[in-house]
Amino acid sequence: MRIGHGFDVHAFGGEGPIIIGGVRIPYEKGLLAHSDGDVALHALTDALLGAAALGDIGKLFPDTDPAFKGADSRELLREAWRRIQAKGYALGNVDVTIIAQAPKMLPHIPQMRVFIAEDLGCHMDDVNVKATTTEKLGFTGRGEGIACEAVALLIKATK
C-alpha cells in the first residue's frame, strides 16, 4: 500500500462561477488559475501522483504550458490516473477536504463524489469529500480564496 497527500490553494479573483470537484458552483467571485482552478481535483491529483511516486500536477501539466490554459481538471485527473494504473496501481480510497468560508460546499458534495468516482473508475464508497471552514481565520476565513487537502491510498493491482 502507498499513501499520497495533496494540497492546493487558489485566490479569488474575477467573476464566478467556480469549479470544485468538477462541479460548477454559482458564486460571485471566480478563482485565479492557469487551468479551471479546481482546488479539489488538483489536490486529489497531487495525492494520487504522490502515492505512485510520479511527481506532482505541476510536473505533469505545467502552468507554463499554453496547452493547459483553462484546462478541465477532470481531464487532468483522468490522465494522471491512466499513468498511475500503467504503473500497476489500483485505488484503495481517497479522502478530500475542501477548506472555504464561502460558498457553502455541502449541497455540491454528492455530485463531486459522483464525478470523482467516474473519473477514477471506482465505487462511490471509495471516495469521500467533505468541507470545513477555518472559523473566519486565515486567508480562507477572510474570503480571499479556497484551499483543499487530499489523501489517497493506492494498492498494487492484481492481475
From Swiss-Prot:
Subunit structure: Homotrimer.
Source organism of this protein record: Escherichia coli O6:H1 (strain CFT073 / ATCC 700928 / UPEC)
Top-level taxon: Bacteria
Gene: ispF
Family listed: Belongs to the IspF family.
The keyword Iron belongs to this UniProt entry's keyword annotation: no
PANTHER family in UniProt: 2-C-METHYL-D-ERYTHRITOL 2,4-CYCLODIPHOSPHATE SYNTHASE, CHLOROPLASTIC
Cofactor: a divalent metal cation
Keywords: Isoprene biosynthesis, Lyase, Metal-binding
GO-annotated molecular function: 2-C-methyl-D-erythritol 2,4-cyclodiphosphate synthase activity; metal ion binding
EC number: 4.6.1.12
GO biological process: isopentenyl diphosphate biosynthetic process, methylerythritol 4-phosphate pathway; terpenoid biosynthetic process
Feature type site, description Transition state stabilizer: H34, T133
Recorded catalytic activity of this chain's protein: 4-CDP-2-C-methyl-D-erythritol 2-phosphate = 2-C-methyl-D-erythritol 2,4-cyclic diphosphate + CMP
Classification of source organism: Bacteria, Pseudomonadati, Pseudomonadota, Gammaproteobacteria, Enterobacterales
Leading EC class: lyase
Name of protein: 2-C-methyl-D-erythritol 2,4-cyclodiphosphate synthase
Pathway the protein acts in: Isoprenoid biosynthesis; isopentenyl diphosphate biosynthesis via DXP pathway; isopentenyl diphosphate from 1-deoxy-D-xylulose 5-phosphate: step 4/6
Residues the entry annotates as binding 4-CDP-2-C-methyl-D-erythritol 2-phosphate: 8-10, 34-35, 56-58, 61-65, 100-106, 132-135, 139, 142
Co-factor remark: Binds 1 divalent metal cation per subunit.
Gene3D superfamilies named among the record's database cross-references: 2-C-methyl-D-erythritol 2,4-cyclodiphosphate synthase (3.30.1330.50)
Task of the protein: Involved in the biosynthesis of isopentenyl diphosphate (IPP) and dimethylallyl diphosphate (DMAPP), two major building blocks of isoprenoid compounds. Catalyzes the conversion of 4-diphosphocytidyl-2-C-methyl-D-erythritol 2-phosphate (CDP-ME2P) to 2-C-methyl-D-erythritol 2,4-cyclodiphosphate (ME-CPP) with a corresponding release of cytidine 5-monophosphate (CMP).
SUPFAM superfamilies from the UniProt entry: IpsF-like (SSF69765)
Annotated a divalent metal cation binding sites: D8, H10, H42
